[in-house]
């Protein structure tokens, strides 16, 4: 079986998601906020899951990050210059809403992150929470609210490449 069959919940995330990332320090004070557009793709090849994150800050700064992932053992796996980790569906979630993810920053073994992703039953919205932990202590929390723009990531990717 392949990634879509083994991870049907993750497969429901395929598409283009627009949202907002809000970061809080350990004391709960907001320290950053920016908008996002994520392209979540399932493709053939060495990296059957590939996510591209486009970030935009209110001051005009932008950033694009690529996250190609391998697939094995009913998980997607990242190992690149930024992160090393994996994501899996929570089998005990009888509503099939929850994906978990953990990773470490490459070159910073003291910092690791756990993410919980909740997909709404209608598949149109999702919320994600990150807990950044350094040396066993909470450093940052990130709250992400997203809505599905379209499942047709190929069309949006082509429009973005054409400057549209």
Regions found by a protein language model. Name each.
Residues 1-64, 134-164:
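Amphipathic/hydrophobic helical signal segments and adjacent flexible N-terminal regions
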Residues 28-114:
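Central antiparallel beta-sheet cores of small beta-barrel/beta-sandwich binding domains
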Residues 76-164:
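Beta-sheet ligand-binding and adhesion/scaffold domains
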């Amino acid at each position: 079986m392949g990634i879509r069959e083994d991870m049907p919940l993750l497969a429901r995330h395929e598409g283009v998601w627009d949202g907002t990332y809000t970061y809080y320090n350990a004391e709960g004070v907001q320290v950053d906020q920016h908008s996002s557009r994520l392209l979540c793709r399932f493709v053939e090849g060495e990296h059957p899951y590939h996510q591209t994150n486009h970030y935009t800050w209110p001051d005009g700064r932008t950033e694009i990050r690529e996250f190609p992932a391998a697939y094995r053992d009913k998980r997607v796996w990242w190992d690149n210059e930024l992160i090393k980790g994996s994501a899996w569906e929570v089998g005990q979630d009888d509503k099939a809403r929850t994906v978990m993810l953990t990773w470490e920053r490459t070159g910073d073994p003291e910092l690791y992150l756990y993410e919980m992703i909740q997909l709404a039953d209608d598949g149109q919205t999702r919320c994600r929470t990150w807990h950044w932990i350094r040396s066993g202590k909470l450093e940052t929390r990130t709250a992400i609210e997203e809505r599905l723009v379209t499942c047709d990531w190929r069309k949006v990717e082509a429009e973005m490449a054409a400057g549209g």
